[in-house]
Amino acid sequence: MPLQPFKTSNLLTMGVELELQLISLSNFDLTAASPDILELLGRSSFPGSFTPEITESMLEIATDVHEEYDQLLKQLFHIRDALVTVGDRLNIGICGGGTHPFQMWSDQRIFNKTRFIEVSELYGYLTKQFTIFGQHIHIGCEDGNQALFLLHSLNRYIPHFIALSASSPFVQSKDTLYNSARLNSVFAFPLSGRAPFVLNWDEFSLGYFEKMEHTGIVKSMKDFYWDLRPKPEFGTIEMRVCDSPLTVERAAALACYMQALCSYLLENKEPLPHEDDYLVYNYNRFQACRFGLDGTLVHPKTYEQILLREDILTTLRRLKPYANQLNSTMALEHIYEITHKGSDASFLREKYAEHRTLESVVNESLKQFRRSK
């Protein structure tokens, strides 16, 4: 069926989705608890929305649509508190983090939902390996053309979000040497990567999408695992590169960083996006995944080599007036702190060095989720 029209949204509104880990408190491994959690959540009023994810040791939550940082953070606190309460009743821990440090993918169970079963039949073992945990950020757009402009203008900032959110250094009991190992699992899927360079919504909808649908490869936008994708049914663009942070404060701060960036980009303060910008896209993405804030980027316009951490700090200075207008200065202060104190990946490595067991690392992640102010 044709791609639905792009819904008009209030510009720069935002929403957050978080994929969270469900932890057995007896051994700190993942546990297939989402059916029980979902049933219990469904019996009471929940301050947001919740859905199953591809395997039963995962849970996705989503906020409402918000305009400002304080509103978003307040709801995330309420959601966190509700999840912790339900988890305590079931003796299940809940935490962030882009990967679980030592779970084995072969132990995971596919959630009994038609779409998930179809995906599992198509992609085989990759589906269980997709037991990874990300944050998705939605930003409201007025029309499809604006959405595509922002989507491609943001491409040079994707490494910022990867490095700032990085929380997946460990996979199957090994330190991967990556700060965000999670994204390597996403890249295994054939429809991952980046969106085609199209700036006109009709051309995207009637040209690209209709052709892809005609091939039989895709049925909806859900079939694309792009780093950034338009969501016409919501009237948003959706960023999908972030690891799930260990705290809801960081989740809110990342959303507001994207909101302020979009506000800045809409004033045409930078050269227009171009297909050639993507010549360095995968390299820059790799640098952020592998080295985090210590990565080195190639600027897509000038080909100058720049330090990722310094590029974030320069961007924060540019965004200060936009954050003031959006009442999100506290959020950008949190981003600034990450550049100086380190990412969640650094925190997890520090805890492993301190305790020398990955079970202790998971326990520290559980504490971080509950400890949010």
From Swiss-Prot:
<dbReference type="InterPro" id="IPR050141">
    <property type="entry name" value="GCL_type2/YbdK_subfam"/>
</dbReference>
<keyword id="KW-0547">Nucleotide-binding</keyword>
<dbReference type="InterPro" id="IPR011793">
    <property type="entry name" value="YbdK"/>
</dbReference>
<dbReference type="InterPro" id="IPR014746">
    <property type="entry name" value="Gln_synth/guanido_kin_cat_dom"/>
</dbReference>
<comment type="function">
    <text>ATP-dependent carboxylate-amine ligase which exhibits weak glutamate--cysteine ligase activity.</text>
</comment>
<dbReference type="GO" id="GO:0004357">
    <property type="term" value="F:glutamate-cysteine ligase activity"/>
</dbReference>
<dbReference type="Pfam" id="PF04107">
    <property type="entry name" value="GCS2"/>
</dbReference>
<dbReference type="InterPro" id="IPR006336">
    <property type="entry name" value="GCS2"/>
</dbReference>
<protein>
    <recommendedName>
        <fullName>Putative glutamate--cysteine ligase 2-2</fullName>
        <ecNumber>6.3.2.2</ecNumber>
    </recommendedName>
</protein>
<keyword id="KW-0436">Ligase</keyword>
<comment type="similarity">
    <text>Belongs to the glutamate--cysteine ligase type 2 family. YbdK subfamily.</text>
</comment>
<keyword id="KW-0067">ATP-binding</keyword>
<dbReference type="GO" id="GO:0005524">
    <property type="term" value="F:ATP binding"/>
</dbReference>
<dbReference type="GO" id="GO:0042398">
    <property type="term" value="P:modified amino acid biosynthetic process"/>
</dbReference>
